[in-house]
Amino acid sequence: MEYSQIHKFDLKAYDSILFISKSIGTYCAAKLAHEYKLTANIYFTPLDFTLEYLQQKDLVYSGTKDQWANFDKIEHYCIYHLIEFHSIVDGNHSLETGNIQTDIENLKQIMYRVETFIHSL
C-alpha cells in the first residue's frame, strides 16, 4: 500500500503514535500500524476487512446493529485474539441506538475508557 503523505514524517522520532479511526479509516490506520509497527490504536466501528491488522494492544468499539459490518465476526475475532472489545447494544454504524439518553450514557462510558486507554500508553 502506498502512503504518499506518511513518508513526510519520521515515525521513528516518536515514542508512540496513536490513531483514532472510524469505519473505512480503521482499515487505513490498522494497515499503517501493522506496516510501521506503531503503538496501539482505537477503532470505532471497524469494517470486516480491517480485522487481519488488529493487534492485542488495540481498543475496538462496534455496534450490535451495525449495518456496514458483521458484528459477530468482529466480536469473535477480537475475543479470540485477546483484543479489548466493547459492544454497543443496539448501536448502528454511528454507535447510535435511537434513544438519546442511552446514546449520551454510552458516549460518556466510551470517552471515559478512551481517556484511560490513552493514559495507559
Residue ranges and their predicted role:
Residues 54, 58-62, 66, 74:
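Short beta-strand/loop motif that positions the catalytic acidic residue
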Residues 19-30:
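Gly/Ala-rich beta-loop-alpha elbow adjacent to hydrolase catalytic centers
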Residues 91-106:
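Catalytic histidine-centered segment of alpha/beta-hydrolase-like enzymes
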Residues 36-48, 56-57:
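A conserved short beta-strand
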Residues 16-19, 41:
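Conserved alpha/beta-hydrolase fold motif
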Residues 109, 113-121:
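C-terminal alpha-helix
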Residues 64-69, 93-94:
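Acidic catalytic loop of the alpha/beta-hydrolase fold
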Residues 1-16:
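Serine-hydrolase catalytic machinery in alpha/beta-hydrolase-like enzymes
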